[in-house]
């Protein structure tokens, strides 16, 4: 589910950003300035793939650990972090009012996240307060993971440029 969502972003982002940069600048100048300052308009598809690989490895390790140890609250934290991410993508699409390179798979995977949440709440021994706590943990981990992914992406981008293999 996560990778399906990430593939849309990796495959579509570079072309989308190229085609929509002026529109972003016109309608969302602060967002465009933020992206420009960080050089994200220049990132290659392979640079975005590095970020996706980073996220996938972390998600897989936490999920494997959760199942192996029976510590399903960690899986719940990952589910909630990803679900909140999808709701943010949905809000971005509603605000932008045009295709963004995450919306198709957001609409396809969000129902699964809702279904998994309902099933988890039906079978868990976690209290509602504990689920809120694990949701906060999931959001915090997702944010930290995002920062570290962009750090790795910036390193990879510089490596690409230095070697002249930037696409």
Where are these regions (language model features)?
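Hydrophobic alpha-helical membrane segments
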Residues: 80-89, 100-120
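Non-cytosolic membrane-interface motifs at loop->transmembrane helix junctions
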Residues: 77-78, 94-108, 128-135
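Core segments of transmembrane alpha-helices
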Residues: 46-65, 85, 108-114
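Cytosolic, membrane-interface loops and tails of multi-pass inner-membrane proteins
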Residues: 10-40, 155-167
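Transmembrane alpha-helical segments that form the membrane-embedded catalytic/substrate-channel core
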Residues: 3-10, 82-93, 141-155
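Membrane-interface helix caps and helix-loop-helix hairpins in membrane proteins
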Residues: 67-72, 90-100, 124-125
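Interfacial helix-start motif at the membrane-water boundary
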Residues: 32-54
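Terminal transmembrane helical module of multi-pass membrane proteins
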Residues: 114-167
């Amino acid at each position: 589910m996560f990778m399906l969502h990430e593939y849309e972003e990796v495959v579509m982002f570079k072309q989308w950003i190229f085609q929509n940069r002026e529109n972003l600048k016109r309608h969302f100048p602060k967002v465009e300035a933020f992206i420009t300052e960080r050089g994200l308009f220049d990132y290659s598809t392979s640079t975005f793939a590095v970020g996706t690989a980073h996220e996938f490895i972390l998600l897989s390790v936490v999920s494997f650990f959760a199942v192996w140890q029976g510590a399903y609250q960690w899986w719940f934290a990952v589910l909630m972090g990803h679900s909140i991410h999808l709701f943010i993508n949905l809000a971005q699409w509603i605000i932008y009012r045009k295709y963004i390179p995450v919306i198709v798979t957001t609409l396809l995977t969000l129902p699964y996240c809702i279904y998994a949440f309902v099933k988890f709440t039906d079978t868990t021994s976690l209290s509602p307060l504990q689920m809120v706590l694990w949701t906060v943990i999931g959001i915090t981990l997702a944010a930290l993971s995002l920062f570290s992914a962009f750090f790795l992406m910036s390193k990879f981008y510089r490596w690409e440029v230095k070697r002249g293999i930037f696409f």
